[in-house]
Every structure is written in C-alpha cells, then in structure tokens.
C-alpha cells in the first residue's frame, strides 16, 4: 500500500528550510520517495508540479507575513526569495494567474 504524504507536515518542513535552495529531490527525500515518484504523486494529489506547489506555499506564507505588517525585504528573505523585487514579481504573477 502507498504511504500517504502528509502535505501539511511537508509544507511546515519546507517553510523551515526556505533559507536554502529546495528542489524536488529535497522534498522527495523528506517523504521517502524518488523524485519521479514524488512528482507523480504531487501532480495527482495537489494538481501541480512540486515546484509549483513549493512556490504556492512560499507565496501563501509571504502574504500572511505582509498582511501582519512585515516589510517586503524581511518577507522576501524569510520566504527564500533572492530580493524584494523577486517576491513582488512573484506575487504579481500569481495574482494575474488566479
């Protein structure tokens, strides 16, 4: 039987590691799957690629921090963006996609 992926726990782990570059392999290792197995499960269970899922997690948390009054520079750093402008561009892109 397939072991279920605890998506909320994976999201919490990812949030604690945003300061370092995360890739599909990092996420897959955390849930004891190969990168290709994880990619397949992510698309099936979350409806998006692992990197899309990770970006959505980062942006959701960034919006929470911004709404709480955190500055753009601090939010960008904590959410793992290279610069404040990279974060604002990502937020703008996401708003256009929804």
Where are these regions (language model features)?
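Hydrophobic positions on the alpha-helical face of helix-turn-helix-like DNA-binding modules
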Residues: 62, 75-76
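A short, Lys/Arg-enriched amphipathic alpha-helix from helix-turn-helix/homeodomain DNA-binding modules
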Residues: 1-22, 28-31, 52-70
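Short, charged low-complexity intrinsically disordered segments located at boundaries
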Residues: 8-12, 16, 41-45, 70-72, ...
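Basic/polar phosphate-binding segments, predominantly the helix-turn-helix DNA-binding elements
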Residues: 21-54, 76-98
């Amino acid at each position: 039987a397939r072991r279920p992926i605890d998506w909320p726990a994976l999201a919490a782990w990812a949030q604690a590691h945003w300061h370092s570059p995360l890739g599909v392999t990092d996420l897959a290792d955390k849930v004891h799957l190969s990168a290709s197995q994880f990619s397949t499960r992510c698309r099936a269970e979350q409806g998006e690629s692992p990197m899309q899922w990770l970006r959505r997690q980062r942006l959701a948390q960034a919006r929470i921090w911004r709404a709480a009054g955190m500055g753009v520079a601090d939010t960008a750093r904590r959410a793992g963006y290279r610069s404040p402008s990279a974060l604002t561009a990502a937020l703008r892109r996401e708003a256009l996609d929804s």
